[in-house]
């Protein structure tokens, strides 16, 4: 593969709802760019990017896979992301490091719930996007209906660049509104070759109508095209492409393309659109960080000779070894070099740098700005942390991770499994920041918590497949949160001899409830001489660790402000241990007296049903303490949006099948914690 300069790099992700055809689009991209020499089909369990055994068995993407391919003069670094709601965090951390994205939409299903979620995640990171309307060969395909859903549900301004020729079984190609040519793919070459012909006479009026709409839409978003349009100056295809590029990168427009990946139609023009309209690392604003000590703002420019600034966005355990996935923003990563992690105030040494192709790896000596690579040798660093030059420290913004909402109790089946379990779980925790593990104080069982039942199923399956660790698994349980109703004060004293040394600490705290979603806060109102300042961080640590397990049922405590109001110090016996323990004791005492209560995980539920079953479905949701948010029509069905406590959703799929004679479907994703 020839070396690309920065201008010719495209870092993109493929994002979509499950079953929109995202991985099939990716497999065709790999085939037509020459990165693979055989088309891998998802339904055959042969997709290159779905390399894990669980992905191949289930026919879904579970983990984001990275690869690099060449299209004409451009190098495309591509991440294929999961579509299932349980793996939303995989999408989130990929979008953090991408410069552009392709949203894949099923022409039958349109904009589905997880499509909305990942699209808005991309909006959060200001990622320019294209939309590819897939599966136009399917019965019920509706190109214009899907475009309208993109406008309405995603609050985007769609720019139609292509029109489908035919529909469903008669879908035969596309009309390109930029070149005003009709594309037809050769089935004998698996779509590798295609013809560009004049538009059929029956379609020319429609094509001219939509080309005029295209120019008007671009003119509204780009001043240069508007000036040419108003002065009636002819707009060349190149000028139009440049205007669309500017409007796409500035997030004003979303170019719309179409095809059928399974039928090998529409992928080459999509690759052209990625090259023409999505940004290079030079086209996006420089990422900003701060100096870890002075908090001074630092701008990281995409220049090879500048100091290093890179972000670890993912960690994987492959063949028992830790592989860190890194996006380089500034400077150059070099194999064998020393880097600095400012979050841990620690230096690390890179042993190898790898260019990734799914689970295959190619060693390279260095990686410059815009590169997305795998790194071996980082021992302490984890997901969301910065790597920088030791003599030019910079701290990039950390990633935010979602809270787990469901848990299972696991027990090792044999003594051998018991010995391996802790080590295996440590590997998964390093890899997956949405996974948590704790020990139940009453039963001694290990409690594994994650984003959903499928998420936990995959973890347990991987324990057995990859590490030979077998466990008994309990029924899924809801992961609640705790908070308090009342403001309360408490004082605790730790005064003991430990290992021949006297330890003394007295701490007084005031706990008060905060608004939902605020998080936990700590502050000190101590008079300066009451307790030496050196012990304040230790007291804060004791409080925050205490809030990790509430007094009601042992769930994490949220939305509480802890204020250090008093205490005392004994010069001969004041120790960090004493103040940490007394802070924890005071916090626990205040929690128990503050009228603690449980918070339920509340889920956004979207149910799609034939209209004749609406009444029964709404009644069932209401009986589960659900609140109906909206009801809207969609392709011969009704879409019901509601919020429902997760605890009331167990067994819902069976109930829905029964109520709708198997014709209803639903999706569910976490919304927030609240009292139900």
Model-found features: residue ranges?
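Structural and coupling elements of P-loop NTPases
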Residues: 1-676
């Amino acid at each position: 593969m020839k070396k690309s300069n920065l201008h010719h790099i495209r870092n993109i992700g493929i994002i979509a709802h499950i079953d929109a055809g995202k991985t099939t689009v990716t497999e065709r991209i790999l085939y037509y760019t020459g990165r693979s020499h055989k088309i891998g089909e998802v339904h055959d369990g042969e997709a290159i990017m779905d390399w894990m055994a669980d992905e191949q068995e289930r026919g879904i993407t579970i983990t984001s896979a990275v690869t690099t391919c060449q299209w004409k003069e451009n190098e495309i670094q591509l991440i294929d992301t999961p579509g299932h709601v349980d793996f939303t965090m995989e999408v989130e951390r990929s979008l953090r490091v991408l410069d552009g994205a392709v949203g894949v939409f099923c022409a039958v299903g349109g904009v589905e719930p997880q499509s909305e979620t990942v699209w808005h995640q991309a909006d959060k990171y200001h990622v320019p996007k294209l939309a590819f309307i897939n599966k136009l060969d399917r019965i019920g395909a509706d190109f214009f209906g899907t475009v309208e859903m993109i406008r309405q549900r995603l609050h985007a301004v769609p720019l139609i660049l292509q029109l489908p020729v035919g529909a469903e079984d008669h879908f035969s190609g596309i009309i390109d509104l930029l070149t005003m040519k009709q594309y037809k793919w050769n089935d004998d070459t698996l779509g590798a070759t295609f013809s560009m012909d004049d538009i059929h006479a029956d379609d020319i009026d429609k094509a001219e109508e939509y080309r005029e709409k295209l120019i008007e839409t671009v003119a509204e978003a780009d001043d240069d095209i508007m000036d040419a349009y108003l002065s009636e100056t002819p707009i060349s295809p190149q000028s139009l492409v440049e205007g669309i590029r500017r409007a796409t990168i500035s997030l004003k427009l979303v170019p719309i393309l179409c095809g059928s990946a399974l039928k090998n139609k529409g992928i080459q023009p999509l690759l052209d659109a990625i090259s023409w309209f999505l940004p290079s690392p030079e086209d996006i604003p420089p990422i900003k960080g701060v100096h870890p000590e002075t908090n001074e703002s630092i701008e990281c420019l995409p220049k090879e000779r500048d100091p290093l600034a890179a972000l670890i966005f993912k960690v994987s355990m492959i063949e028992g070894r830790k592989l860190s996935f890194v996006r380089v923003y500034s400077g150059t990563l070099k194999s064998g070099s020393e880097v600095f992690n400012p979050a841990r105030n620690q230096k690390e040494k890179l042993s190898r740098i790898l260019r990734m192709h799914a689970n295959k790896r190619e060693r390279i000596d260095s990686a410059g700005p815009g590169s997305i690579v795998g790194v071996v040798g980082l021992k302490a660093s984890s997901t969301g942390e910065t790597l920088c030059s030791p003599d030019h420290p910079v701290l990039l913004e950390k990633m935010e991770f979602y809270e787990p909402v469901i848990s299972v109790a696991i027990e090792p089946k044999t003594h051998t499994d018991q010995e391996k379990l802790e080590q295996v779980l440590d590997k998964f925790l390093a890899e997956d920041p949405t996974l948590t593990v704790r020990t139940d104080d009453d039963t001694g069982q290990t409690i594994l918590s994650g984003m959903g039942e499928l998420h936990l199923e995959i973890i347990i399956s991987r324990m057995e497949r990859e590490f030979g660790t077998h466990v008994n698994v309990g029924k899924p349980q809801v992961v609640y949160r705790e908070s308090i109703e009342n403001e309360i004060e408490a004082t605790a004293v730790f005064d003991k001899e430990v290992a021949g040394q006297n330890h003394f600490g007295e701490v007084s705290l005031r706990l008060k409830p905060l608004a939902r979603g605020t998080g936990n806060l700590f502050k000190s109102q101590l008079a300066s001489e009451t307790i030496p300042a050196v012990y304040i961080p230790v007291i804060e640590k004791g409080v925050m660790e205490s809030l990790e397990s509430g007094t009601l049922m042992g769930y994490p405590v949220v939305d509480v402000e802890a204020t250090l109001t008093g205490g005392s110090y004994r010069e001969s016996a004041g120790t960090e241990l004493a103040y940490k323990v007394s802070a924890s004791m005071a916090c626990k005492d205040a929690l128990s007296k503050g009228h603690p209560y449980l918070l339920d995980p509340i889920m956004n539920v979207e149910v799609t049903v034939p209209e004749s079953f609406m009444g029964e479905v709404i009644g069932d949701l209401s009986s589960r303490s659900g609140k109906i948010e909206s009801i809207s029509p969609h392709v011969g069905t009704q879409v019901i949006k509601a919020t429902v406590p997760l605890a009331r959703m167990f067994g819902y799929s069976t109930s829905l099948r029964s109520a709708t004679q198997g014709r209803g479907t639903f999706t569910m994703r976490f919304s927030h914690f609240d009292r139900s």
